UniProtKB/Swiss-Prot annotation:
Entry binding sites for ATP 1: 43-50
A Pfam short name: ABC_tran
EC number: 7.-.-.-
EC primary class: translocase
Domain ABC transporter as annotated: residue spans: 8-248, 309-542
Positions annotated to bind ATP 2: 342-349
Superkingdom field: Bacteria
Family: Belongs to the ABC transporter superfamily.
Subcellular location: Cell membrane
Record-given protein name: Putative ABC transporter ATP-binding protein TTE1589
GO molecular function: ATP binding; ATP hydrolysis activity; ATPase-coupled transmembrane transporter activity
């Protein structure tokens, strides 16, 4: 066999980062990839997925140093002996933090950067720009600075800038992290079309399981090792294995594995297959138990307190003339847990920033605990409303966890004794006691996210706004974060959460407001809104598959557990 028989060959690859003395990031990896294959690599945070990706194009070991052994051969080229600049022609890598990849002053120049550096003639570059803009659906945005694009557009631009180098292999590291459900499908559709049309070899690293169905192969990684490599229809039925390693299993096979004695091979994977299997097995929904769930929901509705936040005819226009909010009317009652949903750029974050006075309406009014925000400031409203940003690193700045959490109470003039009490209380709430002396930036993303929440709790607000609290976290970390949020809500905090993760909305939120183009298009209890599946799709949203399955059976269940509890076998 010559070196170039396979598109990628990885032999006995082990790598340990300099700073990790006691643990290999990847260990004993053996992998072969055929030309034109579409592979999805999945695993929890810290499994070694991104490390493996960076070994494929030579960033490791050429830029990132550490202990490296084994061999990687890409299209017949030994990666360890080849500069990254040469490897970039063979394999393109779209980073997990795609914004870090964008630096040009407009979209066109961003796409041209790679070909220019490879000495491609100007006329050809013009043609490449045209072709790439069409592929990634950014036509008409040639002159827009990347900083003015939405998250989804930036993501597509990062993919386009890599495609412009015309690599034979495209590797994307968690390309859909910040995207709404339809945006995610869009990125996977682009990837699939490229794969089919251009015989491109495609490697996608993902936490999300739903879209992996379309791949040729799925590779599961855990603790730096490959633990499963097979066809999607085989791997995605491994419900127990996926839960064990910290990945979210598909909801449909999980449901049927709990309500039937089906062999793994016979488990349905999609809601369409699920409807058929439900009927085949003669399963039924217990009407009495379903009505009990609805009754408990009605009881909860009656338990909320007074209206504490009120938006009346709110409009907001940014300084560049963009109207971000257009006639918003919304009331939030004490004790509610409301999710703000909508496609990227629909106005969710702009609206949330009005609730703690970070922004003030251009027209209309926002009343928070009886105070008109037009006559208030962040400091005053901050006594009532705390805001955790999407990226915890935009919020964290202190050298120790203790000082980070103590900052708010100290600014409010608390005595050191009271500061100590509040820090202890906040750390207990987020389950991070004992971390007081740690450097926040040395913690994992999930831990930093919890520290950001703790620093808000220390100010003892009544309302907590969470902007994408689970972005970049794996399933186990997401569950842990959301159980914390649920506890905060149950202890009396009102929660306002912005998210794209639909299963989290289904399982944790009470109410939902769906936004598009600065307007609230749908509002109500989560179950009532998720019934309206066609309307949600029009608004770039897609409910979890267990909701889609149950809707087609005449009921709306919000979680696998809920549906299992009402299934008569």
């Amino acid at each position: 066999m010559t070196l170039s028989d396979k598109e990628i060959i990885v032999k006995d690859l082990t790598f340990r980062y300099k700073e990790q003395k006691d643990r290999n990031a990847i260990e004993g990896i053996n992998l072969e990839v055929e030309k034109g294959e579409f592979i999805v690599i999945m695993g929890p945070s810290g499994a070694g997925k991104s490390t493996l990706a960076q070994c494929l194009n030579g960033l490791i070991p050429h830029f990132t140093k550490g202990h490296y052994s084994g061999e990687v051969v890409v299209r017949g080229i030994k990666v360890k002996e080849t500069p990254v600049s040469k490897m970039a022609k063979e394999i393109g890598l779209v980073f997990q933090d795609f914004e870090a990849q964008l630096f040009s002053t407009n979209t066109k120049l961003e796409i041209a950067f790679g070909p220019e550096n490879f000495g491609v003639p100007r006329e050809e570059i013009e043609e490449i720009i045209r072709r790439v803009l069409k592929i990634v659906n950014l036509e008409g945005l040639e002159d827009r600075p990347p900083s003015t694009l939405s998250g989804g557009q930036k993501q597509r631009l990062a993919i386009g800038s890599v495609l412009a180098c015309m690599p034979s292999i495209l590797c994307m590291d968690e390309p859909t992290t910040d995207l709404d459900p339809i945006g995610k499908i869009g990125v996977f559709n682009i990837a699939r079309e490229l794969h089919e049309e251009k015989e491109l070899t495609l490697i996608i690293i993902e936490h999300e399981t739903e879209e992996a169905l379309n791949a040729d192969r799925i590779i599961l990684m855990e603790k730096g090792k490959i633990i499963k490599d097979g066809k999607p229809r085989e791997v995605l039925k491994e419900v127990d294995l996926m839960e064990k390693i910290g990945l979210m299993p598909l909801q449909i096979p999980k449901y049927f594995s709990q309500v039937s004695n089906l062999e793994k091979a016979d488990l349905p994977l999609t809601y369409e297959e699920g409807v058929q299997k439900f009927k085949e097995l003669g399963l039924q929904i217990d009407e009495g138990k379903y009505q009990e769930i609805l009754r408990r929901e009605d009881e909860r509705e009656k338990s909320y307190g007074d209206v504490i936040i009120q938006a009346k005819d709110v409009e907001y226009v940014y300084s560049n003339g963009t109207k971000a909010l257009d006639g918003i009317n919304l009331e939030i009652r004490e004790g509610e847990f409301i999710a703000l949903l909508g496609h990227n750029g629909s106005g969710k974050t702009t609206l949330a920033k009005h609730f703690n006075c970070l922004l003030k309406p251009t027209r209309g009014s926002v009343i928070v605990y009886g105070k008109d925000t037009k006559n208030s400031n962040v400091y005053e409203i901050g006594n009532y409303v705390g805001y955790a940003f999407q990226n915890p690193d935009h919020q964290i700045f202190a050298d120790t966890v203790y000082d980070e959490i103590a900052f708010g109470p100290r600014m409010r003039g608390c005595t050191e004794e009271e500061v100590k009490e509040r820090v202890a209380e906040a750390l207990k709430a987020v389950d991070m006691e004992g971390f007081e002396k740690e450097d926040p930036f040395a913690l994992s993303k999930g831990e930093r996210q919890r520290i950001a929440v703790a620093s808000i709790l220390a100010a003892r607000p009544k309302v907590i706004i969470l902007d994408e609290p689970t972005t970049g976290l794996d399933y186990k970390e997401q569950k842990r974060m959301m159980e914390l949020v649920k506890r905060l809500n149950e202890s009396g905090h009102t929660i306002i959460m912005i998210t794209h993760t639909m299963w989290i909305v289904a399982e944790y939120a009470h109410k939902v407001a769906v936004m598009r183009d600065g307007k609230i298009e749908m509002y109500g209890k989560v179950r009532d809104v998720f019934k309206e599946e066609e309307r949600l799709l029009e608004l770039s949203l897609k409910p979890p598959s267990i909701v889609s399955l149950s809707n087609r059976l005449g009921k709306t269940f919000l979680s696998v557990e809920e549906m299992v509890s009402c299934t008569k076998r």
